[in-house]
Amino acid sequence: MSLLCVGVKKAKFDGAQEKFNTYVTLKVQNVKSTTIAVRGSQPSWEQDFMFEINRLDLGLTVEVWNKGLIWDTMVGTVWIPLRTIRQSNEEGPGEWLTLDSQVIMADSEICGTKDPTFHRILLDTRFELPLDIPEEEARYWAKKLEQLNAMRDQDEYSFQDEQDKPLPVPSNQCCNWNYFGWGEQHNDDPDSAVDDRDSDYRSETSNSIPPPYYTTSQPNASVHQYSVRPPPLGSRESYSDSMHSYEEFSEPQALSPTGSSRYASSGELSQGSSQLSEDFDPDEHSLQGSDMEDERDRDSYHSCHSSVSYHKDSPRWDQDEEELEEDLEDFLEEEELPEDEEELEEEEEEVPDDLGSYAQREDVAVAEPKDFKRISLPPAAPGKEDKAPVAPTEAPDMAKVAPKPATPDKVPAAEQIPEAEPPKDEESFRPREDEEGQEGQDSMSRAKANWLRAFNKVRMQLQEARGEGEMSKSLWFKGGPGGGLIIIDSMPDIRKRKPIPLVSDLAMSLVQSRKAGITSALASSTLNNEELKNHVYKKTLQALIYPISCTTPHNFEVWTATTPTYCYECEGLLWGIARQGMRCTECGVKCHEKCQDLLNADCLQRAAEKSSKHGAEDRTQNIIMVLKDRMKIRERNKPEIFELIQEIFAVTKTAHTQQMKAVKQSVLDGTSKWSAKISITVVCAQGLQAKDKTGSSDPYVTVQVGKTKKRTKTIYGNLNPVWEENFHFECHNSSDRIKVRVWDEDDDIKSRVKQRFKRESDDFLGQTIIEVRTLSGEMDVWYNLDKRTDKSAVSGAIRLHISVEIKGEEKVAPYHVQYTCLHENLFHFVTDVQNNGVVKIPDAKGDDAWKVYYDETAQEIVDEFAMRYGVESIYQAMTHFACLSSKYMCPGVPAVMSTLLANINAYYAHTTASTNVSASDRFAASNFGKERFVKLLDQLHNSLRIDLSMYRNNFPASSPERLQDLKSTVDLLTSITFFRMKVQELQSPPRASQVVKDCVKACLNSTYEYIFNNCHELYSREYQTDPAKKGEVLPEEQGPSIKNLDFWSKLITLIVSIIEEDKNSYTPCLNQFPQELNVGKISAEVMWNLFAQDMKYAMEEHDKHRLCKSADYMNLHFKVKWLYNEYVTELPAFKDRVPEYPAWFEPFVIQWLDENEEVSRDFLHGALERDKKDGFQQTSEHALFSCSVVDVFSQLNQSFEIIKKLECPDPQIVGHYMRRFAKTISNVLLQYADIISKDFASYCSKEKEKVPCILMNNTQQLRVQLEKMFEAMGGKELDAEASDILKELQVKLNNVLDELSRVFATSFQPHIEECVKQMGDILSQVKGTGNVPASACSSVAQDADNVLQPIMDLLDSNLTLFAKICEKTVLKRVLKELWKLVMNTMEKTIVLPPLTDQTMIGNLLRKHGKGLEKGRVKLPSHSDGTQMIFNAAKELGQLSKLKDHMVREEAKSLTPKQCAVVELALDTIKQYFHAGGVGLKKTFLEKSPDLQSLRYALSLYTQATDLLIKTFVQTQSAQGLGVEDPVGEVSVHVELFTHPGTGEHKVTVKVVAANDLKWQTSGIFRPFIEVNIIGPQLSDKKRKFATKSKNNSWAPKYNESFQFTLSADAGPECYELQVCVKDYCFAREDRTVGLAVLQLRELAQRGSAACWLPLGRRIHMDDTGLTVLRILSQRSNDEVAKEFVKLKSDTRSAEEGGAAPAP
């Protein structure tokens, strides 16, 4: 794609002057552009157009039209093939072309013209050089071009020879030589849209960085560069003009005063019009800018550069210099110059030695080759020139001169950039290639010498001519108070090469000065930029002396046009016969009635402008007088405003007075001297209306500035079109507007017909109107499309990139930058100068309070400045936000910043319904600068985070104002987060709540660290009032120590104070995130976690050494527990967690429990000793136990309370504690029981019933208290092991109590035995036998009472006492023991008395016979009892003596009546022990084994012998079993036969043999076997058989059979066979060898059995068998009984020594 540049300069028509009112249209591809209409036969348009060309096979169609009333007529046309157009980067003088009247068509396309006319037009057409070529290639071509040019510069320049040659300097947007009077003025048409003398254009400005090796020339700049190389071959849209067709300059054509309107778009030069010369190496010096700037280079997509390079070896340089000098001379004649050369030299001396003042600014390109010095070209407008440096009077040796920027006192410049440093040596400015540098030195020194000669010559002439002129208007004025700019709008070239860092670019020093906010450099980057401040000072005066708010509106009247007149606003014809439209009586502007509201510019200034143009001097003077009056009134009424401005910018009174005059003059000159170049890039649109039937539109855009209208190409079928087209305009009226309209192109028949009769044949899609006076610098903005009338159907928005260069202000910062300078300096003045650094917050209310930044006067200054120069309120807000960010820690500022940012957020985020533009896009188009504001917010965010991370220091809880600031700071963070999310549209920016939470945690971390490291000092200061104590601790012992625990107690106190402060002061303050942020809780959590970590390690260390008392550890444990329970336990992070702190203290608690056990034991001994001394007295009337129990459990309970109060939340550790404590309880109580048990018997023997009862009560009370302790320790929930220990202890204590009760009861045994003996004596006196008849019951009762009398007396006297002094449980136990004792004694003494007093049977029975229920079978071990009976019997000598004994004891046997008396007595005793429910329970008494045994014994007395024998057989099933040491065995064969008819049983016994008999005898051993049948109802049957004896045989064989007949009434189970092996002795009783028993129940099923029966030494019996045996032994008259007793009491006889057994 190529850029076609077409300059429509002028034309010459064949015809009368009044006949022509012509404009030119240019058509190429599908784009059409139109010039303004100019009257006259020699019109001069001087307008430049640019087209993007992508097809070089087409041509450019130029049509000249003459405006008509109804339609326009073509004057002529010319077609230029694109291939024939030259390539150049510089504008040429143009070429005269003849207009033809016809076009030649081929394939529906124009391919030429024919039929020439007499009309001619001057056009300059060229293509820009190729775009975006690599830098190396650009350098190569530049060098080639330079070499070519140098070939023509071989001869020495002769100043005299070339006097008449014109200066072939091309006109361009940077420098229109005609403005300086250096060209002929050929503008004949007074109504021409361009003006010849009032334009002060110098250079174009743009915001992006020009490419390297690119040089602009600025005649108005205070620093000029003359490049040593030709310009590069282009940047994307750098419209660098190059000179071409040099021969065409032979006849000098006057250049148009307006120069070329082909100027840069806003994207490129506003920050970079002054560039480095080519010798400056961009790679070696920071002036070239950072990568970010390079990025901005690339982003300047729609930007363009314009410049003229004055090359040292330009082909016509030498020839044309003379003409330059002449023109310069003409021009300088109008100026007042310094009187003499001394002043000039004085001015020269002010040139600094180094590049400091400029090289540190990226906005000023200062580098020049070594062989240069700067030279300033004089400006155009008389009396309105900037301070400009003077050129040196002579050319020194060029090789030795270092580059020196000319720097007068106050050259206004943009701010300084600290990053750049001045070059250290000359090398950095040398050409890259030696040959280039050498060439540059030679040619440039010649050129420069020529320039200096010419210039100095003219200057000297002027000085001589003028003499000592008015120094106040001197072109080369001195520095000083009065030396300000006379024209505010002219400024030297101080444009930046990167966006000026208004607020945020210098924030790297953030951390260093965080306390005062973001560094002051951050928010006051313009404070030290004196040049910029100087300029802004003047612009501020200008805005305030005649503010926009005071402008005069138009005075419209209905007006009748007598000739065809067009509306000034819409250019439509004022239709009608009369009263066609409105006309302002003041300024004469005419418009439709519907358009009058669109014309809102200041009427007075428009009138002045028009009058001056039309020469109506008298009218102009009237208006000027009105303006003067108004300004005087303004100055008189508002002096404080101008005084404040003077103070802000620190201007002296004298200078201020002079400047006020100059400002008033500039206002009077006003718009008559105002002009600007505007570059508009139509980027794209969104959301347009669909106008076609297809549901779409074919949109294009027309852009109109003043009378000049241009259009884009059409985008077919798209409601979101992208054009990316650039247009350039010149504007000479600050009250003009830019009218951007979007249309839907219709290309049908209807449209074409409509086009002939109507100016607007296409459908209207929307418009936006932009005030020109509000433009400065460049903007990239979305505009909502507006309606024209209520009928318009409009939607969507359009994006424009607008760049403006105002004449005289090409080199100054844009208005937004100027506003920033004003705002920042005002902020600095009000805050730092007037208020000692404290931000003064204005008292404003209402919805727009956030837009009030200062008090009334200061606010009016910024508002009027913003209104005058079109600074939007959102920019003001962002600028003030930036200023405040440097003071964000000042009181009240965070709240203001939060509100400001919230409104900024609302502005960008809350898009309107009529536009689809996203917040991100709106913000990206912000004039403040997206990157700048984002960077500012990022830095602010970081600073806020850092300060919040020390909120305790920065926002002390003692200051309510600072707490409010803290709250506002968090609000500000929230606003920043909202901005990032809604405006920047970041996906997931850090949540404000999380950021604050992190900050709070960070602060708490550092707080903990601080209190930990300074614990002793802080504690002493805050909590120790006694000054004597403060110095006790040595510094080295103030920290944690293993020798004591004081540190931790103090630390806990400090931690609590921190948490409480957070909870009570900071939590209510930081309440913006109730669900996510609770400072008190976070404080507790963080503090606890840090404390826990340190505490754990400390306790582990203490565990190793154990240098402190266990009580100290316990106390610390309690403090830690309290801290945890009070602040931590309810925190979400800890709710379901078992805390760790019990584990730290577990070893110390166990140690304490160990020590506590020893203490408890010592306490126990002491308590018992005291109790013993006091005689074990009851503790109170109602308490039946002594004080020792109370004391012991008081101690234990105290210990347990301590454990309990630990409230240990760890079940496992609680289990450990409980186990250990349970052991302590067990050991202490068992020791108590042991001590009591040892001495208990002694107390019982002293016949003091009370003390034993108290001791038993004590034991019972131990059990009661133990049960309570068990429940207190957890009961069923108690640790299993601890529970088992306590349960086992309870059982042991129970056993102890049982034993004590038994011992106590046993002490009464002698008395009871005596009483029972008396009972037996009384019972023996009861006469009567047989059963007792019913009539004798009363006598039996009487007998029973008599019998009971002795025992009752004893019991009654004691039990009454026991009931009083014994615990209920103890009483019952004593009663039980007494009950047992009485029952057993009665049984032994009365029912079953011993056989004799000498025998051991009584003892045997006592020991073995009681406590068993009827029928219970004893184990074989009870055979010991039987043995004792037999042994007793043996002691009597012969068995016959036993029988005699039985006869003697007959009286002891009870009669049935006596049994009845005993039965009744038992019932009485039972009732007595029951005691109506107070004593033992009836069920216990009934089921008492002792009672049952007694009753059973009594029942046996009344049973028949057969029944007793049957009972014996049925119960004694183990008589022959379990023989451990058999004395032999017998083989028998037994058969059982039952007669089927009678049921009679017969038993056949065959004795087969004996075997292995163990017997020793001195005589002959003659064994025989005796077989007895035992059972009921055998008194009349044979019960015994015996075999024959065998001599000396220890294994005799018998094979003898016997038969027994049994009763039919009893079954076989009631019988048994007893086999006895005996040694037959003659004349003496046979001796028993062994016994065996075979019970027939075993044969009942089988019928027969053959078995070996082991022989035992005796028969085994249980207590039932013994009882039966004792009862039957008393029946001496019963043969069966005596035989039974004899059989069962038989035992192996004593052996005699002697013979060995037979083999």
From Swiss-Prot:
Residues 186-203, 360-374, 421-433 have a biased composition (Basic and acidic residues). Keywords: Calcium, Cell membrane, Cell projection, Coiled coil, Cytoplasm, Differentiation, Exocytosis, Membrane, Metal-binding, Phosphoprotein, Repeat, Synapse, Zinc, Zinc-finger. Ca(2+) 2 binds at D692, D744, D746, D763. Residues 186-445 are annotated as: Disordered. Residues 265-277 have a biased composition (Low complexity). Its cofactor is Ca(2+). PROSITE patterns: C2, MHD1, MHD2, ZF_DAG_PE_1, ZF_DAG_PE_2. InterPro entries: C1-like_sf, C2_dom, C2_domain_sf, MUN_dom, Munc13_1, Munc13_dom-2, PE/DAG-bd, Unc-13. Residues 319-353 have a biased composition (Acidic residues). It is found in: Cytoplasm; Cell membrane; Presynaptic cell membrane; Presynaptic active zone. Signal peptide: none annotated. Expressed in pancreatic islet cells. Expressed in melanocytes. One of its GO terms (cellular component) is presynaptic active zone. GO terms for biological process: cell differentiation; dense core granule priming; neuronal dense core vesicle exocytosis; neurotransmitter secretion; positive regulation of dendrite extension; regulation of synaptic transmission, glutamatergic; synaptic transmission, glutamatergic; synaptic vesicle docking. A zinc finger (Phorbol-ester/DAG-type) spans 553-603. The keyword Metal-binding applies. Belongs to the unc-13 family. This is Protein unc-13 homolog A.
